[in-house]
From Swiss-Prot:
Gene: prmC
Functional description taken from the UniProt entry: Methylates the class 1 translation termination release factors RF1/PrfA and RF2/PrfB on the glutamine residue of the universally conserved GGQ motif.
Protein name (record): Release factor glutamine methyltransferase
Keywords of the record: Methyltransferase, S-adenosyl-L-methionine, Transferase
NCBIfam families: hemK_fam (TIGR00536), RF_mod_PrmC (TIGR03534)
Native source species: Chlamydia trachomatis serovar D (strain ATCC VR-885 / DSM 19411 / UW-3/Cx)
PANTHER family assigned: HEMK METHYLTRANSFERASE (PTHR18895), MTRF1L RELEASE FACTOR GLUTAMINE METHYLTRANSFERASE (PTHR18895:SF74)
Binding site for substrate: N181, P182, P183, Y184
Length: 290
């Protein structure tokens, strides 16, 4: 086993993988369904398992993200199928959604929740799991992504609604709470991104346009149609877009604030639709603001 892992690590290193030993172990642990690294070194592989292992290693060597190789991720107690038709849920998003769940549990009067540009459904399904009093609707423009989200809802026995369409178009009435992860990379940023992103994740879910801000202009223009008066929303944003997005919404008379992640990078934009105290009550711990 040590020889196999050493050869696997050396192969991944030769392909430019940043943490080759850890990833060689992770891929093997997933294949053998082993959760302990100490148990991994005692395992024995059949010739068929070795063949499957090297097949997965070659995929990773081609810079395919590990989550796509595994085919699933865990997100706040929800097991999610992930394929190249959907973005891979990020750890920053998971930490942030914990705070949104806390907000909804404190504000029981908020009973309708929209997850727009839902992808795998990670946000909406986690909200539904932990806030059963909330009616959750997930939407996406991609039929393939929505099919993955629907499959994830079924496999986790979570009752939610689904709508297919572009941004806010499929919704017929406003919600109390909105979360949206729109495409926000510029073309330049996309072509400069890591191969794992550029070559494998769905580019339509990543690229907003020439500036990367195009979807935020659309959201700011139509936010009053998608949120009730007093409603609140969170938008995922690019790491340097905070001030620009704040100005986009300010120009439409919408108050909001930028939330930074633990690395002090712009990560989310919190907004309110004419609520008198929503900004203060919507504070998200663990994220600084400006």
């Amino acid at each position: 086993m040590k020889k196999l892992l050493r050869e696997a690590s050396e192969y991944l290193l030769s392909r430019g993988i940043r943490f080759p030993q850890r990833e060689a172990e992770d891929i093997l642990m997933d294949l053998l369904e082993i959760s302990s690294r100490s148990a991994l070194h005692q395992a024995k592989l059949s010739s068929e398992e070795q063949s499957l292992y090297w097949k997965r290693l070659r995929k990773r060597g081609d810079r395919c993200p590990t989550a796509y190789i595994h085919g699933k991720v865990h997100f706040l107690g929800v097991e999610l199928q992930v394929t190249p038709q959907v973005l891979i849920p990020r750890q920053e998003t998971e930490i942030f959604v914990e705070q949104i769940i806390g907000y909804l549990q404190m504000h029981k009067e908020k009973t309708t929740f929209y997850d727009v540009c839902c992808g795998s459904g990670c946000i909406g399904l986690a909200v539904r799991k932990h806030c059963p009093h909330v009616r959750v609707t997930l939407s996406d423009i991609s039929p393939e992504a929505l099919a993955i989200a629907e499959s994830n809802a079924r496999s986790n026995a979570l009752a939610v609604d689904f709508l297919l369409g572009d941004l806010f178009d499929p919704f017929s009435f406003p919600a109390d709470v909105l979360v949206c992860n729109p495409p926000y990379l510029s073309y330049k940023e996309f072509f400069e991104s890591d191969p794992e992103v550029r070559c494998h994740e769905p580019w339509k879910a990543l690229v907003g346009g020439v500036s990367g801000l195009e979807f935020y202009h659309r959201i700011a223009t139509h936010i009053h149609k998608i949120l009730v008066s007093g409603g609140v929303g969170w938008l995922e944003i690019g790491s340097t877009q905070g001030e620009d997005i704040k100005q986009i919404f300010h120009a439409k008379g919408i108050r909001g604030r930028v939330l930074k992640d633990y690395a002090q990078l712009d990560r989310f934009f919190f907004l309110e639709n004419q609520a008198n105290d929503a900004v203060s009550s919507g504070e998200v711990s663990g994220f600084s603001e400006r």
